[in-house]
C-alpha cells in the first residue's frame, strides 16, 4: 500500500528519497539540517521545546557516528531546489541489549551486547526515533515515501516490530498513518493537574 501511494506522490509532487553518507552528515551540513527539520516539524507539538545549536552539535557528534545510515531516510522536494521536507531516523532497539548489560555497565562485556544490536541486528525491534514531515507537505502524503523506503529494509533485516516515539492520542493525523499496519498501543502516559491553594 505504501509503495503504491509513494510512487504516485513521487510523480505528482516530485518528492524523492535521499540516503545519506557520513561525509554529507558531518562535512556538508546535513546533520544540522536534519535537526532544523525536526525543530520545524515538532514545533506545534505539546511539550516540545526547540533544540538549541549546542544541543544539535552534541547530538550530531553523539548519535550519527554509530547510526546505521541505511535506516535514516530524508525526503527532498526537487521542485524546491532539493529542499529537505521530511526525515526518518530509526535505530535497532537497544532495550534488550541494555538489559543484558549488568545493570547498564558497558565493561567488561556489556559493550558486546550493544554492538550486536547495532551492527549485527540481534534484535527484532526497530525504534522509530525521530520521524517528521514539514507541515505544508503532510497533506501531500510525503510520509508514505518514508515508510515505502524503510519498511522493506526492516523486513530484509528481520525486524518484526517497530516502536514509535511518544504520540498524542488526540493527534488523529499521526494515528491515521498506522492504519495500514497491524499496530498495537501498549504504552500510555498520563499527566494530571491539581491546583494548589
Question: What role is predicted for each listed range?
Answer:
Residues 37-41, 59-62, 66, 149, ...:
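Generic, well-ordered alpha-helical scaffold segments in large soluble proteins
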Residues 133-138, 164-174:
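Conserved beta-strand-loop-alpha-helix junction that forms the acyl-donor binding cleft
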Residues 18-133:
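A conserved beta-strand-loop-helix scaffold within acyl/acetyltransferase catalytic domains
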Residues 117-119, 179-184:
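Short proline/glycine-enriched turn/loop segments at secondary-structure junctions
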Residues 1-21, 190-196:
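Acyl-donor-binding surface of acyltransferase catalytic domains
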Residues 125, 129-133, 138-154, 180:
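Conserved acetyl-CoA-binding loop-helix of GNAT-fold acetyltransferases
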Residues 163-165, 182-196:
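Conserved catalytic-core motifs of GNAT/GCN5-like acyltransferases
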Residues 125-126, 154-168:
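Conserved GNAT acetyl-CoA-binding A-motif
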